[in-house]
Structure formats: C-alpha cells, structure tokens
Amino acid sequence: MINLMNMTLEELEQMLSEMGQQKFRAKQIFKWINSGIRSFSDMTNISKQLRDELEKVSKISRLKIVDRLQSKIDSTVKYLFELEDGNIIESVLMEYKHGFTACISSQAGCRMGCKFCASTGAGFSRNLTPGEMLDQVMTMQEDSGNRIGHIVLMGIGEPLDNYENVIKFLKIVNHPDGLMIGMRNISLSTCGVVPRILQLAKENIPITLSVSLHSARDDKRSAMMPVNKTYCIDKLISACKIYTVSTKRRITFEYAMILGENDSEQDARELAGLLKGMLCHVNLIPVNTVTGNGYKKSSRIHIDKFKNILESKGIETTVRRELGSDINAACGQLRKNKIDSTTNLLLNS
C-alpha cells in the first residue's frame, strides 16, 4: 500500500489523475499530508467518497515517539522514534539564535563503520524513506510546538548511501506547499562517498555540504574511517573542489578533535596545507564519548591551539557548540542502548 508521506506533488497528481480526479485535489492532499495529519478523516475539504477511495489504496504512516530526553542545561531534546516495521532511529531538536534546527537520521543504522561514531554500533537495518525523514521534522515540530527552520542530515546513517530517497526528501521538504524549508537552510553531512558528491554537484540543489574529514593523512583517516580505503583523501578533496566550482557553495569540513589521535600542532598544519585555497570552512568538533571505542575529546587548550594554527594559515574555523551534552545528544547511542536492552531481554527471557 502506498504511503502518501513518500510522495511528491507530481506523483500525487499522477495518482489522482489515474483515479479520475482533478489536478487541484493533489495539491489539497499534499498540503494536508505536510500539515501533519494522521488520518484521512482530517482532510476536511476532501469529499468522503474520495477519502474512502484513498484509504483503500494508500495510507498515512507516521512515526511513534518511544523516548524523549530533555537537556537540563539547554533546550536540546533527543527523540527516539519507532518506525512502522519496528526499527528504531534517533533525531535531535536544537535551539539556536536563528531558531530551531532538526538533526535527522537518513538510515536505520549505518554501514560506514566510522570508529568514533555511535551510529554504527547497533548495525545497519535499512534505508529510510523520504516520508520517514520528513516525519522526523514534522513530529518534532508538532511535539515541541516550535517552527523548525533548519535541517541537518547528521543523524544516524550516511545520507549519500541513501541518495535517491534523500534527494526526494529534500524536494518534498522544500516545496512551497509543504514545510517550505529553504535549501540554503539544509545541511547534509557525508563521510566522503566520492561518486555521490560528484552526482550531488550536478543536482542544482543549493544545500550546504559538510564532509567528515578528521585527518589530513590517509593512514590516520583510514584507521578511523574505513571509507577512506575506498575513497582516499586525494580523491575526496578533488571531488570537493569540483563540488565548490560547480555549485559556488562553500564546503564545511568537520573535524572531530580526538585526544592524542588527530589534535597535534602537526595535524593542524597538515590540515591547513590540504585545504589551502579551497572555498571551505572547518568546524572543529569535541568528540562525543561513545561506549567501547576508547576515544576521548581533546582539551580546550588543544582545540584552541588547533583553531589558531588553522586561522593563521587563512582557514576559516569554528568550534561546534556542545548542545545537549548531558543527554549525549550525538545520534546513535540511544538507539544502540535500546537495541542492546531489547536483545538482552530476549536472551534472558
């Protein structure tokens, strides 16, 4: 059965045309779906006959909130959602000066295997549909009562490993009859899937691309990120340069500051050399503590020194604010804990 949450306006128009309905009905239904309704009966300007016909061939499938963690030190809220098939994902709602930002997941789990990331810990289940990505934004907006104006695809999963569904989601969430979130207010974070970066450069979608770099050296990056064994740093930087030239958009390079691993002055100088002359920005991220990987965040002194070296070499650099640190707001850990506890319960029953 078709989930209407996954459909673009054009797809709805085609579907309604095949049902013998006028084109304007599709826009009415699209608006209802994107307003957050949970039942066909909520479509008050649609005839009962059409609602009944729709209910026979389609559904409106919504997420279920399993858990909600509210930070005591800021307004950050972490959500644990259950999908229709029982899979679990995470999202985070964050408040900034410019308003509210939704950090959403693109997959149930991740197959990239980055050593410092909790998303990989519980394994990969499947890609999320466009509707499941959209619903994370809608449900957090409904639950909080706050308008979400920015989205970051930095939750569980590698967005470019779910390319077609992510592109479709972006078009739905940006639509003027939908949530109407501007493309320039959307960021997509990738571990560096080079062919997809090159494909994204041709899409004419002016989002912000963030690339998880974390080292300027192949040996160090490969040890932390298996994807580097397939797409080495030279290939990645080459693709990023093509992206900036094609889109005229600045790339953000994310750099997790890990004590004793990649936070030395030499690491900073190597990074500055790698990025010299690029249209880019570096975001230094104090690494989150993830059970089992042994990584610890760099000291503030190390981070500030690293930042100063980059800036002295002409690289624009910021340090990410640690929102929701008391609830471990980085995505993946809560899902892993939930899956582990369920597994233990089944094993001991």
Swiss-Prot record:
Cellular localization per UniProt: Cytoplasm
Pfam families documented for this protein: Radical_SAM (PF04055), RlmN_N (PF21016)
Enzyme superclass (EC): transferase
InterPro entries documented for this protein: Aldolase_TIM, Methyltransferase_A, RlmN_N, RNA_MTrfase_RlmN, rRNA_lsu_MTrfase_RlmN/Cfr, rSAM
BP GO annotations: rRNA base methylation; tRNA methylation
Reactions performed catalytically: adenosine(2503) in 23S rRNA + 2 reduced [2Fe-2S]-[ferredoxin] + 2 S-adenosyl-L-methionine = 2-methyladenosine(2503) in 23S rRNA + 5'-deoxyadenosine + L-methionine + 2 oxidized [2Fe-2S]-[ferredoxin] + S-adenosyl-L-homocysteine; adenosine(37) in tRNA + 2 reduced [2Fe-2S]-[ferredoxin] + 2 S-adenosyl-L-methionine = 2-methyladenosine(37) in tRNA + 5'-deoxyadenosine + L-methionine + 2 oxidized [2Fe-2S]-[ferredoxin] + S-adenosyl-L-homocysteine
Binding site for S-adenosyl-L-methionine: G157, E158, S189, S212, L213, H214, N288
Record keywords: 4Fe-4S, Cytoplasm, Disulfide bond, Iron, Iron-sulfur, Metal-binding, Methyltransferase, rRNA processing, S-adenosyl-L-methionine, Transferase, tRNA processing
Keyword Acyltransferase: no
Its EC number(s): 2.1.1.192
Superkingdom of this protein's organism: Bacteria
Every Radical SAM core domain range: 96-326
GO molecular function: 4 iron, 4 sulfur cluster binding; metal ion binding; rRNA (adenine(2503)-C2-)-methyltransferase activity; rRNA binding; tRNA (adenine(37)-C2)-methyltransferase activity; tRNA binding
Record-annotated disulphide pairs: C103-C331
A GO CC annotation given for this chain: cytoplasm
Main location: cytoplasm
Transmembrane segments: none
Active-site positions on this chain: E90 (proton acceptor), C331 (s-methylcysteine intermediate)
Manner of cofactor binding, per the entry note: Binds 1 [4Fe-4S] cluster. The cluster is coordinated with 3 cysteines and an exchangeable S-adenosyl-L-methionine.
Keyword Iron-sulfur among UniProt keywords: yes
Record's function text: Specifically methylates position 2 of adenine 2503 in 23S rRNA and position 2 of adenine 37 in tRNAs.
Similarity remark: Belongs to the radical SAM superfamily. RlmN family.
Misc. comment: Reaction proceeds by a ping-pong mechanism involving intermediate methylation of a conserved cysteine residue.
Protein name, entry field: Probable dual-specificity RNA methyltransferase RlmN
Organism: Ruminiclostridium cellulolyticum (strain ATCC 35319 / DSM 5812 / JCM 6584 / H10) (Clostridium cellulolyticum)
Gene transcribed to yield this protein: rlmN
